[in-house]
């Protein structure tokens, strides 16, 4: 394996066949609502961390999840997940993060009873990808958080959130995302060990750690 090969445990490949051309088709509210009734919406969600290992979450005030949640939002046709994550990050925090700074955490499918768009009771079906990036102290100091969909924001120690006795009970999707974010450290160490041709016992110990 090449020394600059992406970590296959923390990488979501993007393939383009032929010459794809982005379009700027705009759907009005009614059309968008009908689209949500018929199709699965792709989302690029974010778990930002700082240089101390703290993780940012937002407390939403709108459906489909009016509670603590990841930042982020939908992808647009033609986006890579890194491009979508960067655009969503700029919108919700004011921070511009280059595509190469984003890393894949996990992905999942989701069904929600309610949604923000009318008719709210029709719900929404989503395919969500969670990405992560570490921001600098300077970036954290200049963040301008979006208040349109969030009532508050908070920084948390991710390891504390997944303890059995954690005070804050997370939605299962968010819990999985935080758990996979914590596991990413082990995945990165495993990838580095394989690239360095580390002893089999060291590699095996890291693999076993992922299954605990």
Where do the PLM segments sit?
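Nudix hydrolase/Nudix homology domain
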Residues: 2, 64-66, 140-212
